[in-house]
């Protein structure tokens, strides 16, 4: 028998409704038998003492009592006693100033209570200072000097000394100066020093010098000096050892020199000894100022480069008349006594310290370099009239002092710019 669709739908609906009703009945029966197990924690009856405040819970009322009794503040913290070092009081005789006395700014007060004593101890650590008050009411500068050292003070006035040893080689016909040491009273920062030795005989003189060393109170050279000298010229020869300095501007100065006779009586050969250098008093310069220039030689191109940098302390009899006028430098290249070529720098306004920064180039073969020289003339010229010479100097092996040493340094160091200051002569 085939059932129709409406009958099947009606049966399904009735079955579903019956199931729902049965489930509801079972649920009610369970709640009736166990009423507390089916409730959530928030649905249970809360303990009034342990109840948590909620949104639906009634606000709790507090009883507030007003009182007019004064409120006592908390007691201050009591720090333990601090025992710090007291300021060291320097005696007046140590400062060596009789008109001053040492006092402290601590105010004395009678302790009234233990609390006051504690406060005074704390205040002493902060407010106690050391002051110097004059007795006569006049405030002057007080200078506390370091402890006097007699040995150091004696070295200030001590003359420079030089240690050396002389030996003569008959086969090579040379005089050797070794074991070179120099002791000076002071040293200048940034300065180098070297020893220059020269032997003078009837036919001429020869020179040699050591390498530059950092100047110190005690300077030692590992190298020595070798001076060619014939054995027959030894009794009449005179050796001069000069201690020189060179600053960062390539300015050379003499600390002292020592002259020795090589006859064998005053200085024995083969014995090391100390000699005191004689310092000459510096006379006021009679020159017309100084000029700073650098020279270099390029062997591959056969070119001599002369760079005129600047001059300083230019003065002459006509300096007032030439003030504000033009100043230039004329450079002349000479081979022995013959003038090869001359060039002139640009003109600069006549000041005490004019600046040029100009390079002049000469073509010169390598075989003529040692016998050549460079002559400088500083010229001042007004708007009208001839130029006036303010000073001159000459560089070459024929010269002496810094002019000769500058040329020798150029020969030893090709392709290198070497700058030095040179004194101008009238």
Swiss-Prot record:
Spans through the membrane: 7-29
Any one GO CC term of the record: plasma membrane
Alphabetical UniProt keywords: Cytoplasmic vesicle, Membrane, Repeat, Transmembrane, Transmembrane helix
Lineage, uppermost ranks: Eukaryota, Metazoa, Chordata, Craniata, Vertebrata
UniProt note: domains: The first C2 domain/C2A does not mediate Ca(2+)-dependent phospholipid binding. The second C2 domain/C2B domain binds phospholipids regardless of whether calcium is present.
Species per Swiss-Prot/TrEMBL record: Mus musculus
Protein name: Synaptotagmin-13
Family: Belongs to the synaptotagmin family.
InterPro entries: C2_dom, C2_domain_sf, Syt13_C2B
Tissue: Expressed in brain, heart, spleen, lung and testis.
């Amino acid at each position: 028998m085939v059932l129709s669709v409406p009958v099947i739908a009606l049966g399904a609906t009735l079955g579903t409704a019956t199931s729902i009703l049965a489930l509801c009945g079972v649920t009610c029966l369970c709640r009736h038998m166990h009423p507390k197990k089916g409730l959530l924690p928030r649905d249970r009856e809360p303990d009034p003492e342990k109840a948590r405040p909620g949104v639906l819970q009634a606000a709790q009322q507090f009883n507030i009592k007003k009182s007019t009794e004064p409120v006592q503040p908390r007691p201050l913290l009591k720090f333990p006693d601090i025992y710090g070092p007291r300021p060291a009081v320097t005696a007046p005789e140590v400062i060596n100033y009789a008109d001053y006395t040492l006092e402290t700014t601590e105010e004395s007060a009678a302790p009234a209570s233990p609390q006051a004593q504690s406060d005074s101890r704390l205040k002493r650590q902060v407010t106690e200072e050391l002051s110097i008050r004059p007795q006569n009411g006049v405030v002057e500068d007080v200078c506390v000097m370091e402890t006097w050292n007699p040995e150091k003070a004696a070295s200030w006035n001590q003359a420079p000394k030089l240690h050396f040893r002389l030996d003569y080689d008959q086969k090579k016909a040379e005089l050797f100066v070794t074991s070179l040491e120099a002791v000076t009273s002071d040293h200048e920062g940034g300065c180098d020093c070297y020893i220059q030795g020269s032997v003078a005989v009837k036919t001429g003189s020869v020179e040699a010098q050591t390498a530059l060393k950092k100047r110190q109170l005690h300077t030692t050279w590992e190298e020595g000096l070798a001076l060619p000298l014939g054995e027959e010229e030894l009794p009449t020869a005179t050796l001069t050892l000069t201690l020189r300095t060179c600053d960062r501007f390539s300015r050379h100065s003499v600390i002292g020199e020592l002259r020795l006779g090589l006859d064998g009586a005053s200085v024995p050969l083969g014995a090391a000894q100390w000699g005191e250098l004689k310092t000459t008093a510096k006379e006021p310069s009679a020159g017309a100022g100084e000029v700073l220039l650098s020279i270099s030689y390029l062997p591959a191109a056969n070119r001599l480069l002369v760079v005129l940098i600047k001059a300083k302390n230019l003065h002459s009899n006509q300096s007032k008349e030439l003030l504000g006028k033009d100043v230039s430098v004329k450079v002349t290249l000479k081979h022995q006594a013959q003038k090869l070529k001359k060039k002139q720098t640009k003109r600069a306004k006549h000041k005490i310290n004019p600046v040029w920064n100009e390079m002049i180039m000469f073509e010169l073969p390598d075989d003529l370099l040692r016998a050549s020289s460079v002559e400088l003339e500083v010229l001042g010229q007004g708007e009208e009239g001839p130029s006036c010479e303010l000073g001159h100097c000459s560089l070459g092996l024929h010269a002496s002092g810094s002019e000769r040493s500058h040329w020798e340094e150029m020969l030893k160091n090709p392709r290198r710019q070497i700058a030095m200051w040179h004194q101008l002569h009238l």
